[in-house]
């Protein structure tokens, strides 16, 4: 979605929501679309909601759909309460916060990507070489705007705690003006 990642046809584009996250020192994480697994919780939830609400219930109007959805979401929250309570506390946006969409980017963005047949990943509208030995596998790519680099780590479903560094890529993003509104 361009609101988050920026216009896909332009290299190095960063959208307004990602800029908001970076300004608030929150690290945006992007997972590959339609990729199954723990790293894609929202895609999994959307699939569950469609199966349990949208496809299961026949409703006459949007109010009935909202009621079915509310019941499902309440049940889902009850089932996942322990995990939610164990998550880090959420912070409020500071009252004096003023978003400057034109400020230079600071902090990090993380992209979970699957390498292609040559060991490259596609992110920020570009291809980056990760490893010729890591083909068709998941990699965590940390774009560090402060240190001007992209660090790529191997991800394995069988050993999620082991994430060896595959490569560090020099990355100098020129500060481009932001086009658009909040």
Feature names for model-found ranges:
Residues 1-64, 75, 161-162, 167-181:
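RNase H-like DDE/DDD metal-dependent nuclease/strand-transfer catalytic core used by mobile genetic elements
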Residues 67-71:
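A non-catalytic, amphipathic alpha-helix used as a structural packing/dimerization or gating element
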Residues 73-182:
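C-terminal, beta-rich DNA-binding module of retroviral/retroelements integrases
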